Amino acid sequence: IERENIFLSIGRIQQQKGQLETLRFLNSFKEIETNFMCYFVGGPSGSSGEEYLLELKESVKELSLDSHVEFLGNLPQVDIRNILNKAKLLIHTSQYETFGLVAIEANSMGVPVLTTNNGSMQEIIVNEENGYLVDGLHYQDVNTSIKNLINNNQYFEEVMINCMHKSKDYRWENTVDRLLDLYQEAKFS
């Protein structure tokens, strides 16, 4: 599968989702690689969503990321799927995430995830297997790995296969089977 050097950030535009951290990563990353584009998919949400979007757009200018970042707003699911099929990385910097469904969806389409090592994400993402976990927001630690991911097709294909395999753990039938096992275990304990 031939993919482009596209990064994605998918989710509502609000501080909780941490898109400003994504911009900080991109600013750090462009120091070692300039051949990439990051699309932000999702519209402003909540009382401060519009204000946060303006802050993000200002940061894009201040960080000289104009040629690397585009805000696409809300898109139909079919369009999100199409862009995921072209992407090489999902950047997920949400500060609080009870369950990272977007990460599983990206993995199911062969897209690795760069995320923070907190909450449920550390259960979904296995570092350097189906994505990259960073402590806090120290993205410099993964810049070289991400550069390798987008420039080494053989490595990308290995990670892509890992992503698709890992996402199968979260198929509904597997989830139901695990839930039934838990009930059986509780029943006979």
Question: How should these model regions be labeled?
Answer:
Residues 10, 37-57:
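Glycosyltransferase donor-sugar binding loop
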Residues 74-75, 82-87:
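Short alpha-helical donor nucleotide-sugar binding micro-motif in glycosyltransferases
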Residues 103, 112-115, 125:
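Short hydrophobic beta-strand element within catalytic cores of glycosyltransferases
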